[in-house]
Amino acid sequence: MRLRGVAGALLGAVVLVALGLMGVWWVFYPKKGDRGAAVAREPVLLHIDPAQMEAADEPLTLPPIERSRERMSAWSEQECLRQLEYPTEKAVQALEHANEKRIQQMLEAVP
């Protein structure tokens, strides 16, 4: 009974390998109509009208700026508080540590 299982597994493996090889052959082997088709093609010549290549007489104008909110000359305190984000103590300490590390590296690099 065990021999039958091994033979079946071996047969299945052979079939899978054969299918894989056929798939690779089918993808990479050129078809009968495609042989030499790339070599036989003639180059395509394009013609561009020289008038289209000339620069415009006037410089192009930029489109107007579209703002998402009305521009104010001065902000109220409420607007400032809404836009301002105070850093946390942890963020300040992390920044201080990174700055100290960079300063130390620069001082060590000085001869």
UniProtKB/Swiss-Prot annotation:
Annotated TM spans? 7-29
Question: How the protein sits in the membrane?
Answer: Single-pass membrane protein
Q: What is the name attached to this protein's record?
A: Uncharacterized protein TP_0368
A Gene Ontology cellular-component term: membrane
What keywords would UniProt list here?
Membrane, Transmembrane, Transmembrane helix
Per the UniProt record, the source organism is: Treponema pallidum (strain Nichols)
Q: What is the lineage of its organism?
A: Bacteria, Pseudomonadati, Spirochaetota, Spirochaetia, Spirochaetales
List locations, semicolon-separated.
Membrane
